[in-house]
């Protein structure tokens, strides 16, 4: 059995043997250690694989790259799978492999089925992934959708490469925004009893807040009702709602807690949290994004993790007191300024929670820890790496991946989003409009750090310009061929087809075979680089090659040997498209 990555390894072995021969002959010094890089050529006229080894070793050898390339080629051992080796340009070495090497990829694919392309590259390595982790203060919007699709795809790719992946969502259930959420629900609840009271302008304004308030009213009646006068009496007169709206909002939250008391406040708070978090969970599950754990921030306090982090930073000399607060000496570890850990009122900051949460991740013994953040969190990178050093943890284990938010266009008009303002397009609305498949694919078809203009009309179109439709249509077309086969007197003899793969000699077939052989390498590269867009682009290429082949050749022909060989080939294409789409969280329909 062969795949492209296996062929690369074989060529690398041949080159290493050639280098050892050149060392024996004195052409290269014994201490020379080559770094061999083998790439797939883009032009078949230049062979199937190429290496720049002669260019990288020319200085150590003391000769021109082309002359060294000649020496390397002369020293190469013979191989039954390589038909020709040529030198191109200043010293590139091109390898041409036998057609039989590519034809055997069909049998490899059909034998492995849904497992083709999977590897044990990451066997024994555990990876912790955190992604989305949007505050449970409202429904997910289209910006969150990109992080969800990207994170889920990266997790799938790492799993396919043999890594054991733990998927986690961090639930911010203990921050200031949650207090504002509880306040927003409570004010809407009071308005439901016709209280003459206005929702503070910086509170959460969406219709979903009213829905939660109505459910609260239906279940608890007037249990949480207080007069407008009693509320206003709790708001300090010196706070101007226009001059300092955030301070005014905080005063409201304090008033709510005082009036309701701990038990009733917790009841309102929990009703809001449960409603929104359940909605987020359902939304993501419908989107095909699932988690192994939903980790609440409140657990950090409950299990003493914040104190554990604080103690460790203190032990290492990175904590000091100023103005009644406890500070992290972040500037000593590369950050632009020191950070408050514990406020003077004794409450931990968001930063302290970040420290505790990452300490918890590292304490679990993962080999890799991946945080996927929105691009607006780029400033977090130096501070996170800084406190990891302060904790005595290895920052190189942490990989922070930034995802640009998707920008949604309806026609030529850009849609703005604001969670507190309530005017935003939700992920659910997007999914219902364009479908899960289009949303999942469009979100990951560009590099995550590139801006994504999400074209609604293109995502809904059934045309060749819509990449996900084009790929799915290739799969459906192949299914159609096999349905047509059942209506004829012809049969499909898979073993006979395997015996006649050498008949696949057209340029279309050679191109498809070469592309099929690249699939395992694409999965490995996409996994190691956290780059699902590489798989998306590969599937577009494969689909395009198949459509060209479909339009040029016939499959249900009279020639039994060629028919069976071609049916095996397109069955392999069908399997790879299905495997690839599955990793991207996209369906492979049999009819369209």
From Swiss-Prot:
One of its GO terms (molecular function) is ATP binding. HAMAP family: Arg_tRNA_synth. The keyword Transcription regulation does not apply. PROSITE patterns: AA_TRNA_LIGASE_I. It is an enzyme of class 6 (ligase). GO terms for biological process: arginyl-tRNA aminoacylation. It comes from Coxiella burnetii (strain Dugway 5J108-111). The lineage of its organism: Bacteria, Pseudomonadati, Pseudomonadota, Gammaproteobacteria, Legionellales. InterPro entries: aa-tRNA-synth_I_CS, Arg-tRNA-ligase, Arg-tRNA-synth_N, Arg-tRNA-synth_N_sf, ArgRS_core, DALR_anticod-bd, Rossmann-like_a/b/a_fold, tRNAsynth_Ia_anticodon-bd. Pfam families: Arg_tRNA_synt_N (PF03485), DALR_1 (PF05746), tRNA-synt_1d (PF00750). Monomer. It catalyses: tRNA(Arg) + L-arginine + ATP = L-arginyl-tRNA(Arg) + AMP + diphosphate. This is Arginine--tRNA ligase. It comes from the Bacteria.
């Amino acid at each position: 059995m062969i795949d492209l990555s296996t062929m690369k390894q074989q060529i690398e072995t041949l080159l290493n043997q050639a280098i050892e021969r050149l060392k024996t002959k004195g052409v290269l010094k014994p201490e020379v250690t080559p770094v061999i890089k083998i790439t797939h050529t883009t032009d078949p006229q230049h062979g199937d694989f190429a290496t720049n080894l002669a260019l990288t070793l020319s200085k150590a050898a003391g000769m021109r790259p082309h002359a060294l390339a000649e020496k390397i080629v002369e020293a190469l051992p013979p191989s039954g799978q390589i038909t020709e080796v040529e030198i191109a340009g200043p010293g590139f070495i091109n390898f041409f492999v036998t057609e039989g090497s590519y034809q055997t990829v069909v049998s490899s694919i059909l034998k492995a089925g849904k497992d083709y392309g999977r590897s044990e590259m990451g066997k024994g390595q555990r990876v912790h992934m955190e992604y989305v982790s949007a505050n449970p203060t409202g429904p997910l919007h289209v910006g969150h959708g990109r992080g969800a699709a990207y994170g889920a795809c990266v997790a799938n790719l790492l799993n396919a490469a043999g890594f054991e992946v733990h998927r986690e969502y961090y639930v911010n259930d203990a921050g200031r925004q949650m207090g504002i959420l509880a306040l927003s629900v409570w004010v809407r609840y009071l308005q439901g009893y016709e209280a003459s009271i206005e929702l503070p302008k910086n509170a959460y304004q969406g219709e979903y807040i009213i829905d939660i308030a109505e459910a609260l009213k239906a279940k608890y009646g007037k249990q949480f009702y207080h007069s407008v006068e009693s509320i206003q009496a709790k708001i300090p007169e010196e706070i101007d709602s226009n001059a300092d709206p955030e301070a005014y909002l905080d005063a409201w939250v304090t008033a709510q807690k005082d009036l309701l008391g701990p038990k009733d406040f917790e009841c309102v708070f929990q009703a809001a949290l449960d409603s929104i978090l359940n909605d987020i969970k359902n939304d993501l599950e419908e989107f095909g994004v699932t988690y192994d754990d939903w980790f609440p921030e409140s657990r950090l306090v409950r299990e003493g993790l914040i104190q554990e982090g604080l103690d460790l930073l203190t032990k290492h000399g990175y904590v000091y007191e100023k103005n009644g607060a406890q500070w992290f000496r972040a500037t000593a570890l590369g950050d632009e300024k020191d950070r408050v850990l514990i406020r003077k009122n004794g409450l931990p900051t968001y930063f302290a929670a970040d420290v505790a949460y990452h300490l918890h991740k590292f304490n679990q013994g993962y080999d890799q820890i991946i945080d996927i953040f929105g691009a607006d969190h780029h400033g977090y990178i130096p501070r996170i790496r800084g406190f990891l050093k302060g904790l005595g943890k290895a920052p190189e284990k942490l990989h922070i991946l930034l995802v640009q938010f998707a920008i949604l266009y309806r026609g030529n008009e850009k849609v703005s989003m604001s969670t507190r303002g309530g005017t935003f397009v939700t992920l659910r609305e997007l999914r219902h409009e364009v479908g899960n498949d289009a949303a999942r694919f469009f979100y990951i078809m560009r590099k995550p750090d590139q801006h994504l203009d999400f074209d609604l009309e293109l995502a809904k179109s059934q045309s060749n310009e819509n990449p996900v439709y084009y790929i799915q249509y290739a799969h459906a077309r192949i299914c159609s061929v096999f349905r047509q086969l059942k209506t004829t007197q012809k049969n499909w003899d898979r073993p006979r087809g395997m015996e006649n793969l050498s008949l696949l000699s057209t340029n279309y077939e050679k191109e498809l075979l070469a592309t099929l052989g690249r699939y395992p390498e694409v999965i490995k590269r996409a996994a190691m680089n956290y780059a699902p867009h590489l798989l998306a682009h590969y599937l577009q290429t494969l689909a395009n090659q198949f459509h060209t082949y479909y339009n040029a050749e016939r499959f249900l022909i009279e020639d039994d040997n060629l028919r069976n060989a071609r049916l095996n080939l397109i069955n392999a294409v069908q399997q790879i498209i299905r495997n690839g789409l599955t990793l991207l969280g996209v369906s492979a329909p049999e009819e369209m």
